Amino acid sequence: MADLVVTAAQVARAHDNAEIFNGLAAETITAGQAVYMSSAGTYGIADANVVGKQQARGLALEGAAAGQAFSFIKRGPVAGFTIPQAYDARLFLSDTAGALADAAGTLSVPCGRVMALSDSAKTKVVYADFVWADQF
């Protein structure tokens, strides 16, 4: 399992057609990290090998300290990742806290796919697709 490399300063939605939500951070969150909602209604860093934290809800679009508001994307294209995987490859929550990977972690949590933008370079981005209703 290989984790995707993220450059926090470059994380941004790659298209206007996206589902974006706001939340309060339960801990320090970095742009590009996968987040989950805690039972207290705040958001922490998701992790595929910790029961409860595998309930990933999206990717942080900006960093936040504990108690600060931040935005995260539930569904849509996200730039800022180095993606060696093939176009349309499935992406999963990693056993590394906050990371996405090319294979399932301890708990299998699909999070999206590799997508090509419509530019001439066919730039690879993460197409975030976090399913809330059907998870665990």
Predicted regions and their residues:
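Glycine-anchored, exposed beta-strand/edge motif detector
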Residues: A2-F136
